[in-house]
């Protein structure tokens, strides 16, 4: 009857087309081979298989695995497992096979819907009711895996965790009468619950994303150890039962009958013989079965041996290659050490120089402060300031005096203009008055002539009439005429006096014109007329001209100044942006500090979780004690259990004490961490202080530069003012000379004109003489006529009077005597009056004629003078108009600009007010004159009214005379006008030509002057610019040199301090490692747990770091101890197998004795092993060592960060120094230019006094040019100063940036070099430590050897540590691995939990077959050829579903090998890990617990090919900086994590060993395979084409993931796990030996540096 293997359970998931058919065929062949085996072979294999069973029927396996699991994670708080305890019979009893075998399947079913940890421990384990399951781990469906050696079956779920120890898959059904081979020992029967347990189960639907198809199952034979134990327990009972039957038959027979007695005896003997025969037959059959089984095992072992020989040859070749590589690396290391030494010396020199520069700077600053404080400098400054203030005051006073002079001159000019205007108005008024007087005189003459005629007519009429009344009327008229004559005479006198005054003024005017005052005043009038018309002064004109010249010549300068201002604004914005960036950097640093604080809190939380796990382990220990008390074997072996319990309790107390010590260490570590934070904060404060000091120095330097530039500006300004003033004075003199020459020419021309005028005057005098002669003739003739008329009138009057007297006498004589007397009196009176009237009339007529002649002469003279004046005025007006036109054309722009000036408007208002006042005065005067004239006219008219009658006659006479005079005057005036017109036309032509010539000459001269002035200004400005640029360059160079020297000194000092501090830290760490190694060595030699020492010396290291260092070292030593024990147990079991086989063939009857001896030997062995295994401290110390390493890495990362920051600051300082040097050069150049300008000033100041006394007319013209040039120079100087300021600011900003970059690069370089050296030394030491020379020596020797190797490792670690090339690929591609982070964070917990499982029952060593190895090699070759053609979807599906290594990938992640989750071709490479080696599990896994998180990010989960289709070469072009928040371990890969080709070796070698040496063989194979892997991993990996691996390392690094991993890496598991449990749990997943072709492919690949200096340098070329 054959066992029914469920074919459905053996099928694998075939959801993709990429399933390997060859692997499936091999699976089918293996299935057929197992089903065809006979029952006896299966029985033998069940009892004799050394492999641990994965089936649920193996209650013994469960009972032994679970306590080991618990012991791994909580070695300090849990009891030792039961299978390790020595019993009296020498066997290890199974305490749980009867108790919970039936419940296991039910429990596994209940685990599906619960929360799962990464290692399968149920979160809700505290709520479990059954006490049988409180002490073991629970596993969900995810942990049930197929145990076939090809490893094709896997789960496609996303929440895959590490495999458990007990399979929850559907199991095969054992027959009811099945009994294993017992070797004549009693076999324990399975209880009825076994049948229920053997039933397969379907996975519940509650588990998300998990396939519900049946699981694949491999036949797992029953373990020999269980069989032996059951035989020991059950054989005595079976024997006792048989003898009781015989005794009963014997006693029941009749005692009387002898025949019956004999028959019965014979029957008994026969039965006894039959039983003996049966027993012999059974033994024979059993021996045959055993022989068959051993033959079968021998064949398997031979095949394994062939494979091992091949692998040994390959490993030897790889070892040789690795040794060559090691020699090369040593050479490189020595070279690097030399470079490091040279760099350290350079750093020391730089620091010394930096210190010197700092001291010099401080001394200079102190000297500057002292100089500032010193009284002499203050006095000099005060004197300088006083001198400057005095000069400014003098300058201002001079300016004010000049302005006052100008104002006075302008006022004088205005007054003269007013006088001229008044004189002109007076002349006009006088002319008008003269015209009016002429008109009045003509009217009077006309009237007089008329009155004469009328009087003559009246006289004639009177003479004719001769009446007395007429005579009286005539007398009255005569009286009136006489009175009017008197009035006219007075008016004539007044008019003559006014005419004299005007003549005197005209003579004065003519004399002034002859002397040249008129020309000068006319020249002044040229300016004054235009100014009067515009209402402005010469000062404003000068300013306006200055502004115009600035506007014309300084356009480019203004534009350049605006551009400079814009540049200044942009530079100011850049400085503000740098400050903002620095502030942002400070904020980032604060955020990082907060992140580190959060990390510390998370570490504290992890400590709390560890304490919780310790409590859980205590609870589990109590549960174990309860289980032991309640177990069915307690009654039989209570004494042993009590002893074991006492031992466990004692160990528990010791572990509790150690735990308390560790807590103290943790507290000390926290204190050290706080100290480190404080030191970091102090460093940050120092950095801030340095930055503030630098900013303050920068500000002081800028202020100093500003002061120097201001002083320089003032000096240059004064110098330029003096130079320009001198130039302008000289130019003014030249212009004044030119103008004077022109004035002389004009005077000469005026003299000629005066000569002509003199000729004209002579002609006029001749005419006047002729006129006088004519007037005299006319007067004589008129006098004669008057005399004649008078004589005639007198004669007529006498006759008339005589007649009247005669008549009156006659009448009077006749009338009366009285009347005669009266009449006589009246007549006498009348005669007197008439005579008098006649005489008066004659004299009056003569006088009037004289007056008229004089008036005519005067009028002619006045007309001549007036013509001359008009000609002169017209000449002056024309010249002034021409000059004004030229001036208006030349200064048209200035006039346009001037109207907008406020001063112009104010002056206009003033001039308008003055003009209005003068007009008002003139109007008042004119009104008063008009009133006076009107009064006179009125009086004259009133007088004339009385004499109208008399004057008619005189008027007729006068009219006749006037007509004659007018005719003569008109003739003379016509002659004069004709002569004057001819002379005026000639003179106008000549003057017009001369004015045009003068105008052209003036324009030419003005243009030449402007061109020369502009050229001079441009030359001076260009020279000033050149000198200013030179000084600026010199100042900048000087400042750069000073800054460079200071930076060099500061860098040297800083490098020295940092190197000393790093050396001190390294020395302290190494001393602590040595001391810990000595203590571990003493503990191992004494075989007793010694209390941990507190740190004796006061070290700067953290207490937690020291504690972790101790823990790591102890853990490594414990791993070596376990290896040694495993080797010893394996050797002993081999010997015992051989002896037992010999004894079974020879002795049949002495079986019980041999069994007793065997049990005694086993008991003694277990007792020795129990003694040796009571020291589980080493593993805990290894864990603590790893924690300390992590702390060390964290501290190093912080130090590197600080170094980076310092390096950046140094770079900034260098940049600032360069900028300062440039500024210094610039300032020196400016100083030189300043000195040159001062020399020029001194040279030019000497002739300046002579130039300071110019002519007033010239000074007005040159002040404008002077002011214009000053404004231009000032604008250019302000531009230059602003540009220098901008350059300084920009230089400071750039220097800061350069110093920061330099600091970063230097710190990064140092950090990378030291990290690389550290990792190299550490890996080499681990490699040497993990090497096993194959000497099967005693346990103590091996322990001593391991301790000595650890001590040498600690000595080697004294060299500086760094990671130069590892950071090159850690800073990229992290956003792609978020899905993988969720897995690796769970797996990271499982990394710590399975840390202490199976030492004897190793599930790694099962189900490895040669067929599966060959299949895997073929698959690797095929997938390597097709690896680059994988698409995104295919790559993802291949990794997610059809890959044959999902559980192995998880196990590799859990074992710190999460670096290896690469894309398709590399999946085969990752399986060659030294999973069998317990030493690797102890040391290397703990070394890479921290790197597992980081390496988990190197290659994310199976979704990786979706993002990167195919494998690509990744060439790093720049050195990346390690992320501060990432993992602290930069180790790319552990020595075990890449290739572990010897994992199958251990499992296959165990198949041919006896059933009793299974546990020992597990450890021996693990040690052998690990040593081979450690010796060959560098060489083997050197040929691997894994460029893509390191490319993905560079691309998958992320801050968040690194932070998560770094936080979760230190969380201990919820329950205790042996560090080897995860290592041993991966063999069933299908480890594969590399074929020779595969190795050749690896070695042929080119080597390319990926940036990681790892033991696998050629993996970067994987394509």
Swiss-Prot record:
Residues 44-57 have a biased composition (Low complexity). It comes from Xenopus laevis. Residues 266-516, 571-664, 696-796, 843-886, 946-977, 1014-1047, 1182-1288 form a coiled coil. It is found in: Cytoplasm, Cytoskeleton, Microtubule organizing center, Centrosome; Cytoplasm, Cytoskeleton, Microtubule organizing center, Centrosome, Centriole. Its main location: cytoplasm. Residues 1-60, 1383-1408, 1595-1628 are annotated as: Disordered. GO terms for biological process: cell projection organization; centriole replication; de novo centriole assembly involved in multi-ciliated epithelial cell differentiation. Keywords: Cilium biogenesis/degradation, Coiled coil, Cytoplasm, Cytoskeleton. This is Centrosomal protein of 152 kDa. PANTHER family: CENTROSOMAL PROTEIN OF 152 KDA, SHC TRANSFORMING PROTEIN. The gene is cep152. The keyword Cytoplasm applies. Belongs to the CEP152 family. Residues 1603-1613 have a biased composition (Polar residues). The keyword Cytoplasm applies. GO terms for cellular component: centriole; centrosome; cytoplasm; deuterosome; pericentriolar material. InterPro entries: CEP152/SHC-Transforming. Necessary for centrosome duplication; the function also seems to involve cep63, cdk5rap2 and wdr62 through a stepwise assembled complex at the centrosome that recruits cdk2 required for centriole duplication. Acts as a molecular scaffold facilitating the interaction of plk4 and cpap, 2 molecules involved in centriole formation. Also plays a key role in deuterosome-mediated centriole amplification in multiciliated that can generate more than 100 centrioles. Overexpression of cep152 can drive amplification of centrioles.
């Amino acid at each position: 009857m054959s066992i029914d293997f469920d074919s459905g359970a053996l099928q694998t998931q075939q959801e993709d087309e990429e399933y390997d058919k060859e692997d499936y065929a091999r699976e089918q062949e293996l299935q057929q081979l197992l089903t065809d085996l006979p029952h006896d072979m299966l029985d033998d294999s069940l009892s004799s298989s050394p492999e641990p069973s994965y089936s649920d029927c193996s209650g013994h396996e469960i009972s032994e695995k679970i306590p080991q699991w618990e012991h791994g994670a909580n070695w300090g708080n849990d009891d030792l497992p039961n299978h390790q305890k020595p019993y009296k019979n020498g066997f290890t009893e199974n305490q749980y096979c009867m108790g919970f075998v039936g419940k296991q399947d039910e429990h596994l079913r209940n685990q599906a819907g619960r929360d799962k940890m990464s290692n399968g421990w149920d979160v809700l384990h505290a709520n479990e009711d059954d006490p049988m399951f409180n002490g073991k781990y629970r596993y969900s469906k995810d942990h049930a895996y197929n145990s076939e050696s090809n490893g094709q079956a896997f789960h496609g779920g996303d929440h895959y965790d590490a495999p458990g120890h007990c399979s929850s898959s559907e199991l095969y059904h054992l027959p009811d009468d099945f009994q294993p081979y017992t070797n004549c020992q009693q076999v324990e029967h399975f209880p009825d619950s076994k049948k229920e347990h053997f039933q397969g189960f379907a996975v519940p639907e509650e588990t998300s994303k998990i396939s519900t198809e049946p699981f694949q199952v491999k036949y797992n034979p029953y373990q020999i150890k269980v069989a032996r134990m059951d035989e020991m327990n059950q054989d005595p009972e079976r024997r006792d039962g048989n003898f009781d039957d015989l005794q009963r038959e014997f006693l029941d027979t009749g005692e009387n009958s002898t025949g019956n007695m004999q028959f019965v005896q014979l029957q008994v003997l026969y039965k006894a013989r039959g039983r003996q025969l049966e027993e012999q037959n059974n033994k024979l059959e059993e021996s045959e079965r055993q022989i068959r089984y051993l033959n079968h095992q021998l064949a398997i072992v031979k095949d394994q041996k062939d494979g091992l020989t091949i692998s040994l040859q390959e490993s030897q070749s790889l070892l040789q290659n690795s040794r060559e590589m090691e020699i090369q690396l040593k050479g490189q290391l020595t070279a690097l050490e030399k470079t490091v030494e040279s760099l350290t010396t350079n750093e020391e020199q730089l620091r010394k120089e930096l210190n010197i520069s700092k001291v010099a700077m401080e001394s200079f600053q102190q000297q500057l402060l002292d100089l500032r404080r010193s009284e002499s400098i203050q006095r000099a400054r005060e004197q300088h300031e006083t001198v400057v203030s005095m000069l400014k005051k003098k300058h201002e006073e001079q300016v004010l005096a000049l302005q006052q002079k100008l104002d006075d001159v302008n006022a004088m000019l205005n007054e003269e203009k007013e006088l001229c205007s008044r004189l002109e108005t007076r002349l006009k008024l006088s002319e008008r008055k003269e015209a009016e007087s002429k008109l009045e005189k003509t009217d009077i003459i006309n009237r007089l002539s008329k009155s004469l005629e009328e009087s003559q007519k009246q006289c004639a009429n009177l003479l004719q009439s001769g009446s007395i009344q007429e005579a009286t009327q005539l007398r009255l008229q005569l009286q009136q005429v006489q009175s009017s004559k008197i009035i006219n005479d007075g008016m004539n006198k007044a008019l003559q006096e006014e005419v004299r005054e005007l003549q005197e003024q005209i003579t004065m005017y003519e004399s002034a014109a002859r002397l040249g005052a008129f020309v000068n005043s006319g020249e002044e009038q040229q300016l004054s007329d235009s100014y009067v018309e515009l209402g402005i002064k010469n000062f404003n004109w000068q300013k306006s001209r200055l502004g115009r010249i600035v506007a014309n010549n300084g356009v480019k300068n203004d534009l350049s100044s605006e551009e400079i201002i814009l540049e200044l604004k942009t530079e100011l914005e850049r400085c503000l942006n740098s400050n903002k960036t620095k502030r942002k950097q400070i904020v980032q640093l604060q955020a990082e500090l907060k992140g580190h604080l959060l990390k510390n809190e998370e570490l504290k939380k992890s400590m709390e979780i560890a304490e919780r796990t310790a409590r859980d382990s205590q609870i589990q220990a109590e549960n174990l004690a309860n289980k032991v008390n309640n177990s069915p074997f307690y009654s039989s072996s209570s004494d042993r259990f009590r002893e074991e319990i006492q031992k466990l309790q004692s160990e528990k107390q010791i572990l509790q004490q150690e735990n308390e010590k560790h807590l103290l260490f943790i507290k000390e570590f926290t204190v050290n961490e706080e100290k480190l934070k404080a030191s970091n904060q102090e460093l940050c404060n120092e950095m801030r202080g340095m930055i503030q000091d630098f900013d303050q120095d920068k500000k002081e330097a800028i202020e100093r530069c500003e002061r120097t530039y201001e002083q320089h500006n003032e000096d240059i300004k004064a110098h330029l003012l003096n130079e320009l003033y001198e130039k302008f004075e000289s130019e003014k003199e030249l212009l004044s000379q030119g103008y004077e020459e022109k004035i002389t020419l004009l005077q000469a021309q005026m003299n000629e004109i005066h000569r002509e005028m003199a000729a004209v005057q002579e002609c006029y005098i001749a005419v006047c003489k002729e006129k006088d002669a004519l007037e005299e003739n006319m007067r004589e003739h008129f006098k004669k006529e008057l005399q004649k008329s008078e004589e005639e009138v007198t004669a007529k009057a006498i006759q008339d009077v005589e007649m009247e007297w005669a008549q009156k006498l006659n009448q009077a004589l006749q009338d009366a005597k009285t009347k005669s007397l009266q009449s006589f009196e009246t007549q006498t009176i009348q005669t007197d009056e008439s005579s008098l009237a006649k005489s008066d009339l004659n004299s009056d007529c003569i006088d009037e004629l004289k007056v008229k002649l004089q008036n005519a002469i005067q009028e002619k003279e006045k007309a001549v003078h007036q013509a001359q004046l008009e000609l002169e005025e017209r000449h002056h007006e024309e010249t002034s108009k021409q000059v004004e036109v030229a001036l208006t054309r030349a200064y048209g722009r200035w006039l346009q600009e001037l109207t907008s000036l406020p001063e112009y408007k104010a002056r206009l208002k003033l001039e308008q007010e003055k003009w209005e006042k003068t007009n008002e005065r003139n109007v008042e005067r004119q009104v008063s004159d008009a009133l006076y004239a009107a009064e006179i006219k009125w009086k004259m008219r009133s007088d004339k009214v009385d004499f109208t009658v008399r004057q008619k006659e005189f008027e007729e006479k006068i009219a006749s005379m006037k007509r004659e005079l007018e005719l003569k005057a008109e003739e003379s005036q016509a002659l004069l006008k004709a002569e004057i017109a001819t002379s005026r036309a000639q003179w106008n032509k000549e003057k017009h030509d001369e004015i045009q010539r003068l105008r052209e000459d003036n324009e030419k001269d003005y243009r030449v002057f402007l061109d020369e002035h502009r050229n001079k200004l441009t030359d001076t400005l260009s020279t000033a610019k050149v000198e200013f640029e030179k000084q600026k360059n010199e100042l900048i160079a000087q400042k750069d040199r000073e800054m460079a020297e200071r930076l060099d000194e500061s860098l040297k000092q800083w490098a020295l301090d940092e190197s000393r501090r790093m050396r001190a830290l390294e020395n302290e760490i190494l001393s602590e490692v040595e001391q810990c190694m000595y203590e571990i060595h003493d503990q191992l030699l004494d075989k007793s747990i010694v209390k941990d020492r507190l740190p004796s010396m006061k070290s700067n290291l953290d207490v937690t770091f020291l504690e972790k260092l101790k823990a790591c070292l102890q853990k490594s030593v414990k791993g070596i101890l376990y290896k040694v024990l495993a080797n010893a147990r394996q050797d002993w079991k081999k010997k015992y197998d051989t002896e037992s086989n010999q004894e079974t063939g020879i002795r049949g009857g002495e079986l019980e004795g041999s069994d007793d001896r065997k049990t005694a030997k086993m008991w003694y062995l277990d007792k020795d092993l129990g003694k040796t295994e009571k020291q589980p401290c080493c593993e805990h110390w290894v864990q603590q060592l790893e924690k300390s390493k992590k702390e060390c890495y964290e501290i190093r990362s912080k130090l590197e960060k600080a170094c980076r920051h310092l390096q950046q600051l140094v770079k900034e300082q260098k940049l600032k120094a360069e900028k300062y040097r440039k500024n210094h050069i610039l300032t020196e150049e400016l100083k030189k230019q300043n000195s040159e300008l001062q020399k020029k000033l001194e040279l030019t100041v000497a002739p300046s006094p002579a130039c300071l006394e110019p002519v007033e007319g010239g000074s007005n013209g040159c002040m404008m040019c002077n002011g214009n040039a000053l404004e231009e120079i000032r604008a250019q100087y302000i531009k230059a100063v602003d540009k220098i300021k901008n350059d300084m600011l920009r230089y400071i900003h750039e220097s800061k940036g350069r110093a920061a970059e330099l600091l970063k690069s230097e710190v990064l370089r140092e950090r990378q070099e030291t990290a690389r050296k550290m990792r190299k030394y550490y890996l080499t030491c681990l490699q040497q430590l993990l090497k096993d020379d194959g000497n099967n020596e005693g346990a103590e020797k091996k322990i001593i050897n391991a301790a000595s190797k650890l001590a040498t490792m600690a000595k080697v670690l004294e060299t500086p540590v760094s990671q130069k090339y590892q950071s090159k690929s850690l800073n990229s591609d992290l956003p792609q691995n978020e899905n993988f982070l969720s897995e690796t964070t769970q797996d990271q917990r499982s990394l710590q939990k399975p840390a202490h499982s199976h030492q004897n029952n190793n599930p790694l060593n099962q189900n490895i077959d040669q067929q599966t190895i060959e299949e895997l090699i073929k698959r690797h070759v095929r997938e390597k050829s097709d690896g680059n053609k994988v698409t995104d979807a295919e790559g993802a599906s291949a990794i997610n579903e059809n890959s044959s290594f999902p559980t192995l990938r998880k196990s590799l992640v859990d074992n710190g090998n999460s670096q290896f989750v690469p894309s398709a071709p590399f999946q085969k490479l990752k399986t060659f890990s030294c999973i069998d080696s317990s030493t690797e599990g102890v040391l290397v896994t703990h070394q890479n617990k921290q790197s597992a998180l980081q390496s988990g990010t190197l290659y994310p989960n199976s979704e990786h090919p979706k993002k990167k289709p195919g494998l690509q070469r990744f060439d790093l072009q720049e050195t990346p900086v390690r992320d501060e928040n990432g993992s602290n371990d930069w180790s790319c890969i552990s020595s075990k994590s890449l290739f572990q080709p010897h994992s199958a070796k251990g499992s296959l070698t165990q198949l041919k060993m006896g059933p009793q040496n299974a546990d020992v063989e597990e450890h021996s194979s693990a040690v052998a395979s690990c040593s081979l892997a450690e010796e060959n991993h560098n060489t083997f990996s050197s040929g691997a084409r894994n460029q893509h691996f390191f490319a993905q390392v560079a691309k998958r690094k992320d801050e968040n993931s690194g932070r998560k991993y770094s936080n979760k890496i230190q969380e201990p598991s919820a329950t205790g796990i042996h560090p080897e449990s995860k290592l041993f749990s991966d063999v069933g997943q299908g480890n594969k030996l590399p074929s020779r072709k595969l190795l050749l492919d690896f070695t042929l690949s080119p080597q390319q540096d990926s940036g990681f200096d790892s033991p696998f340098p050629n993996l970067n070329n994987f394509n």
